Amino acid sequence: MSKKILLPLLLLSVAAFAASGRYWNTGLGGTTMKFLSMQASPRSAALSGAGVASPVRLSELTRNPLAATAVSQAEIGFSQIVFGDAGADNFVSIYYGLPLNDLFVLSMGLEFLGYGDIEGRDEEGFETDEYAAYAWAAQAGIGNHGRPFAWSLQARFAYQAIDDESTLGILADAGASYRVNRFVAFGATVTNFGYVTDSEYDGEHEAAPMALQAGITGTVPVGELLHLESMWDVHLSADIYRRADMEDFEWRFGGEVSYREFIALRAGYALRPETEDAISAGIGITFGSCVFDYGYSPRPALGSGNHYLGVGYRF
């Protein structure tokens, strides 16, 4: 069964690597719908985007298809980003996961990004009428769970409008991971692979924000190593990431100290060639059927940062 699933994932990965030119090496600023690649979940933001091989929260679903493989019971929830200075007015994502049986998981997600009135300027810099901008995306997917080899596939429809210009996207995500044992896991994903309608901003074609990410996560059972009756664990992740319009790869590192599923303290650091590096942080709490998450991702260039809030309910 795993070979039958691995083959299409492998073919999709090869196709993604083979998508050269305008689709993969677009150059700086060559992609549209970049909101589909920004961090959306508190946990991912706190880990600076690391941890693709070991998702824990279903809220990671819209950026990491492998999040569906971590589902053990039905869950619904939402996440919101509170932007710092010079950010959007609102970003909300809603997610849902449902185990169909002992093997498969159905997942769905919806997200909306909205800006308030934006001051218009003409080619000479003079003020014109205000305009609005917004974007949304809906997705559905299927994956497996409870297996050493995990996989997930997602389909997404996206829409973006800026003033009187609009763009449609029909995209797909795929991911596969392998847990060697309870201490080490490897994973890789292809996200936003597909087609977007032409939108001629400034006379330049813009492609989908296709991205590749691969990583490894190691778990250190602190309690066992110290021969303590403790359930504290340390999870360390290292990932490599590249979006189609990036000239260089990003290196992402994240750490999570957790006590069972009750509490998790998180921090991350990313080496981003095109932007400033910074340390992110966050916390996660599980209380019965309720899941609460918070993450903070700084934006040094603007002297502020984004706050990520998430609430989920398992049933």
Where are the language model's segments positioned?
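Positively charged n-region of N-terminal signal peptides that target proteins for export
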Residues: 1-5
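Intrinsically disordered and other compositionally biased segments
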Residues: 7-9, 95
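A periodicity- and composition-biased signal for non-globular, repetitive helical segments
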Residues: 9-10, 40
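Hydrophobic h-region of N-terminal signal peptides that target proteins for export
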Residues: 10-19
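Subset of outer-membrane beta-barrel
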Residues: 19-315
